[in-house]
Amino acid sequence: MDSTYIGSYGRLRVYQTEFFSRQQIDQMLSMTDPKDVSAFLYNGPYREDYDSLSAVFKDPDLTEMAINRHMVRNNRLVLFAIPPLAKNAVVAYLSKWDIENIKTVISAKFLGHGIREAEPFLVSFRDIPLGIMSGTLTNEDYRNMINLPNIEAILNYLARFGYGTYMMQFLEDYRKTGDISPMLYSLDRYYYMNLLSALKYYRGDEAPVLNYVRSDIDRQNIVTMLKGKVLKIPFERMSSGIIDGGNIGVNRLREIYSSQDAVSVADALKQYYDLEEPKKKYMETGDLYHFDIAIRNIIARRFLDTMSMLPLSLDSLFYFILRSEIERHNLRTIYLSKVNGMPREITESLLITEMM
């Protein structure tokens, strides 16, 4: 235990009571009108988020942005109470939202969309993306990028932050093929490389967090491989989407990828992740998302309980951050399922339920 965490731990313990319970999630699942879900959120911990955005946005964008904003508010609680030794690790982790926002901007530019179409998808707080809390990209940066003439100009702009320099190695391929996916994959590799480095040189109580991150890399790689197998893409061509640093090494992933099809890949992964249930659902529906959700739940079950039991440590901070992320995922899934008239059983299959 580390006494420098006492202040942050006490503050976060108070705010943990605001996370929705399984019973409250079930209440929202039973609703049929998205307006009822919005009202439920507004009458709970999300009122401030709605009030700050309602003058500019209307549903469904309003509720999506309120959910994003609330998660960022929770992350601010962590950042403002963080012990000095934990700062690099937490900031490195939270830069994932810079990565997601950059992907949104590049994809919007690729599709010919402007800032108005892209803005609802940016994870922001009072018009300030989370990255500004970590000392990187501001909302003005995102507006500048979306107004640039092309993707190459965006990469040049990002060079000052490190992201663009790393992505430049894929620029020539993009010019030849018009395919932006290698660039987007490179952002994930850049993110995890920096995160693992920040955790590797911490102080010794980061093992659950480090194992969580390595398992999340596994998840990304497994999902990429399953997509590649369905599309019949050779491993070498798909390798730009494979991330180093997971529990399953790249050579082992290559061996597994030589399996006949997606079902065989899932079987070959059994020693790492039991994917029998999502495999059955995939065979019934053809939907690969079952694997992603199943692995997310497996990882949450393996590590979040342990993090919650290590109160004065880096793990306690990450437990709160990850609970906030899971709630964001679940609330967005429930709300958008109501907007799109999705059956409850499908909605439930998309939820991360292990820590509710």
Swiss-Prot record:
Keywords: ATP synthesis, Cell membrane, Hydrogen ion transport, Ion transport, Membrane, Transport. The keyword Ion transport applies. One of its GO terms (cellular component) is plasma membrane. Disulfide bonds: none annotated. It is found in: Cell membrane. Pfam families: vATP-synt_AC39. Signal peptide: none annotated. GO terms for molecular function: ATP binding; proton-transporting ATP synthase activity, rotational mechanism; proton-transporting ATPase activity, rotational mechanism. GO terms for biological process: proton motive force-driven plasma membrane ATP synthesis. It is a peripheral membrane protein. InterPro entries: ATPase_csu/dsu_sf, ATPase_V0-cplx_csu, ATPase_V0-cplx_csu/dsu, V-ATPase_V0D/AC39_subunit, V-type_ATPase_csu/dsu, V-type_ATPase_csu/dsu_dom_3. The keyword Ion transport applies. Its main location: membrane. Belongs to the V-ATPase V0D/AC39 subunit family. Component of the A-type ATP synthase that produces ATP from ADP in the presence of a proton gradient across the membrane. Has multiple subunits with at least A(3), B(3), C, D, E, F, H, I and proteolipid K(x). HAMAP family: ATP_synth_C_arch. This is A-type ATP synthase subunit C. It comes from Thermoplasma acidophilum (strain ATCC 25905 / DSM 1728 / JCM 9062 / NBRC 15155 / AMRC-C165). The gene is atpC.
